[in-house]
Amino acid sequence: EFRRVLFRSTYRSGLLSNLVFKGFNRKIKQPKTVFDWLSRDEAVVSLYQSDEKCNFVFTATGFRDLFTLITKANNPVTFRKTPKDLPLLFISGDKDPVGRYGEGVRRTVNLYRGNGVKNIEVIFYKDARHEVLNELDRLETFGDISRWLETHLAARAARQAVEQEPETAAE
């Protein structure tokens, strides 16, 4: 009976939610909310806390899907199958508890590099927490993403232009 209730798609477990999320504020001195781990921007945290589309307990199915995604993303096959010429950008706050304060990101980058992916850029934002796009220095983050995209899209366009040039006939 317990398993049937627990794994019902609409069941919401406060216990499971606490097990997953509760420790994320652990390294924050005097947190004001349970969501302070998301961002240093108090206005963003306040909006998050008051938004019913953000502030809710996952369903059992939601947690199952989250854990499935994490498992697949960390599967060695994923790293092996990644195209070796695929440019990757990793961005993270160095105070993000989900990424284990940079350790998880560095581990992931090393796994990609160990599987032959060479074109990887990593940016850690000082004192930023989990949601780097909602942090106090988000304009810097947006600029870094824009620069990275422009650089890689321009390089791709240049490669495609060279590939499409007609070969000149030998004289």
Spans of features found by a protein language model:
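Alpha/beta-hydrolase-fold enzymes
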Residues: 3-53
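Active-site nucleophile elbow and catalytic-triad environment of alpha/beta-hydrolase enzymes
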Residues: 59-80
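Short, proline-enriched alpha-helix->beta-strand connector loops that line the catalytic pocket
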Residues: 82-88, 115-118
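Short beta-strand/loop motif that positions the catalytic acidic residue
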Residues: 90-92
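Acidic beta-to-alpha connecting loop that harbors the catalytic carboxylate
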Residues: 94-97, 128-129
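Conserved alpha/beta-hydrolase "acid-adjacent" motif
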Residues: 97-107
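Catalytic active-site module of serine/aspartate enzymes centered on a nucleophile-bearing elbow/loop
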Residues: 115, 119-171
